[in-house]
Regions:
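Terminal-region recognition feature
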Residues: 1-191
C-alpha cells in the first residue's frame, strides 16, 4: 500500500474508490476514467503549490525511487566498479559504467537502500572516506576515457563516525569536490 501525505488526502480518497471499482465485478469504465482524470488534476493542483515543508516530506518519502532504481531503469550493460584502491569499498556510493542508447557513460550515486537489510548494507546512504575516494576514482576514469558522467544526488550526509574521521573524512570530501570541479568531461547531476 502506498503511503499518503496529509496534503494528499483527497487523492487517497479517489484511489480508495478506484480500488473498490477495479475489484467490482461490474466495472464502470466511465466512472473509472472520470476519477482518474480527477485524480490527475488534483496531483497537478497539489504539487504545483507545495510549501517548503511539503517538498521536504516528498523528498523523504520512503517509497520514492533510489539511485539503484534509476540506474537499473536508465542504463544497459551495467558494470559496477568497487573500492577506492586504498582501504575498502563503501556501499553507500555506487558507481560504474553503463550505456544509454548504446553510448557509454559513467555513473555515480548515493544509495540509501529500500529495506532494512539494504539500508544497513548501504549505511543509510552516509558515505565514509572510501566512498568519497571511490567518487574521485570514477571522476578520474570518466575524464581519462573522455566519457560523460551522470551523478545521482540523494544523500543524508557524510557518515559522522569516529572511524570515518580518523580515516580522513573531511579531506576526502574536500578532494572529491576539487576533483569534480576540475573534471574535464561532461558531468550531469540529478538531485
Amino acid at each position: 500500500n502506498m503511503k499518503y501525505f496529509e496534503f494528499e488526502s483527497e487523492i487517497e480518497k479517489i484511489e480508495t474508490i478506484l480500488d473498490q471499482l477495479n475489484n467490482n465485478q461490474e466495472l464502470n469504465i466511465d466512472k473509472i476514467k472520470k476519477l482518474n482524470n480527477e485524480k490527475d488534476e488534483l496531483y497537478k493542483k497539489i504539487y504545483s503549490n507545495l510549501d517548503p515543508w511539503q517538498k521536504v516530506q516528498v523528498s523523504r518519502h520512503g517509497e520514492r525511487p533510489h539511485t539503484l532504481d534509476y540506474i537499473e531503469n536508465i542504463f544497459t550493460d551495467i558494470v559496477f566498479l568497487h573500492g577506492d584502491k586504498k582501504y575498502a569499498d563503501d556501499n553507500a556510493i555506487v558507481g560504474g559504467l553503463g550505456k544509454i542508447n548504446n553510448k557509454s557513460v559513467f555513473f555515480i550515486g548515493t544509495e540509501k537502500g529500500n529495506t532494512m537489510e539494504t539500508r544497513i548494507k548501504h549505511n543509510f546512504g552516509m558515505a565514509k572516506p572510501e566512498g568519497y575516494r571511490k567518487v574521485q576514482r570514477l571522476l578520474k576514469l570518466a575524464e581519462k576515457f573522455k566519457l560523460p558522467l551522470i551523478s545521482f544526488v540523494d544523500t543524508a550526509g557524510a557518515f559522522p563516525g569516529k572511524d570515518a574521521e580518523e580515516r580522513g573524512q573531511a579531506e576526502a570530501i574536500a578532494l572529491s569536490m576539487k576533483v569534480a570541479l576540475n573534471c574535464e568531461t561532461p558531468c550531469i547531476s540529478i538531485i
